[in-house]
Amino acid sequence: GDLVHCDFGITYLTLNTDCQELAYVLKPNETKAPKYLEDALIEGNEVQDIMTGLFEKGKTGNEILSETLRIGKEKGYKPQIYTHPLGTYGHSAGTTIGMWDSQGGVPFNGDFPMNYNTVYAIELNTKVFIEEWNKEIRVMLEEAGTFEETGFRYVNGRQTKLILIGDQRVHLGN
C-alpha cells in the first residue's frame, strides 16, 4: 500500500479553492488502511483543531501561528502551518497564518488581525514517524473554512478518513 497526497484547486466565477487530501492505495485483499496511517491522519486533524480553536477576532495571524506551534509541540506534534485567505486568487488578501518557509511569523500579512466573515485555506502539516516504514511522513491537509461571529467551521467538512484507492466495494456501492 502507498500513501498518496493530492493538492488541487478550482476557480469558478472568479473565486478560488485550495485543497489537499490523502489517499491510501490498498494492497490486494486489504479493505482498510493500516491503523498507523489512520492514527497519523488523526494527528493532522488535531493540529487543525488546535489552530482553528485559536481563531479570535482581532488576534493576528502571527499570534495564532505562535500559539499553534507552541501547543502542538507541547502535545508532541511536529506542526508546520501555512494557512492563507481564499478569494479571487489562491492566496488572497488578508490575515496569513505562517508560510511553509516562515514559521517564526510572516511580516506584514501575518500582522493583520482576524476578522469575521472571512474564508481561509486551513493549510498545514504535521510530521509523524511511521515505525512500520521506518520513516517520517508529513500529513499534509488543506480545507476551506470560514470564520464567523459564531466561530470557525469548515465550508464542506474536512478529511477525517483516508480515501481508499482500489476498494471496489465503495466504488460500486456495495
Region spans (language model):
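Active-site neighborhoods and metal-handling regions in enzymes and metal-associated proteins
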Residues: D2-N174
